[in-house]
Amino acid sequence: MVKLDRAARGLFLAELVRGLSLTFSYMFRPRATINYPYERSPMSPRFRGEHALRRYPNGEERCIACKLCEAVCPALAITIEAEPREDGSRRTTRYDIDMTKCIYCGLCQEACPVDAIVEGPNLEFAAETREELFYNKEKLLANGDRWEALIAANIAADAPYR
């Protein structure tokens, strides 16, 4: 009886028919994928993309040169140099991030006491040369200026969980 059952299954190719029916059932369902460059999926406010340095509304940069982000970076991708100003506060003279080393862990953003360094919503920052991935202070401030509205909205949305 067992041999007859096995022969009947082999003759009628039950597994093949079951697999084909599953394939055909998926063929008529709505697509689960999106057409990326033309359609965008929603992004979480916690998305960690391209780095940016933020400014206060009066235009002054937020970074107070505490160097916590440099100390906490596991990839050693951040380099900061600072000088005291006339009023006694410190400000950065050099703020570099080597994006080839960065692992996008977000520890720099968590360590910053004034929300100066953030990982913004930009995920499309490909470069043609390696040198373009070495971000200096001017590039980071320009990123912050470009994405400030969205960065502020993301930080506000994430505020209850911080």
Curated annotation (Swiss-Prot):
Record-listed E.C. numbers: 7.1.1.-
Tagged with keyword Metal-binding: yes
Record: residues binding [4Fe-4S] cluster 1: 63, 66, 69, 112
Disulfide bonds: none
Recorded GO CC terms: plasma membrane
Cofactor(s) required, per the database record: [4Fe-4S] cluster
Topological relation to the membrane, as annotated: Peripheral membrane protein
GO biological process, one term: aerobic respiration
Cofactor details (free text): Binds 2 [4Fe-4S] clusters per subunit.
Residues annotated as binding [4Fe-4S] cluster 2: 73, 102, 105, 108
Record keywords: 4Fe-4S, Cell inner membrane, Cell membrane, Iron, Iron-sulfur, Membrane, Metal-binding, NAD, Quinone, Repeat, Translocase, Ubiquinone
GO MF annotation, one: quinone binding
Entry's family note: Belongs to the complex I 23 kDa subunit family.
NCBIfam families (alphabetical): NuoI (TIGR01971), PRK05888.1-4 (NF004538), PRK05888.1-5 (NF004539)
Subunit relationships: NDH-1 is composed of 14 different subunits. Subunits NuoA, H, J, K, L, M, N constitute the membrane sector of the complex.
UniProt-listed PANTHER family: NADH DEHYDROGENASE [UBIQUINONE] IRON-SULFUR PROTEIN 8, MITOCHONDRIAL, NADH DEHYDROGENASE UBIQUINONE IRON-SULFUR PROTEIN 8, MITOCHONDRIAL
Protein name, UniProt field: NADH-quinone oxidoreductase subunit I
Organism: Rhodospirillum centenum (strain ATCC 51521 / SW)
Gene that encodes it: nuoI
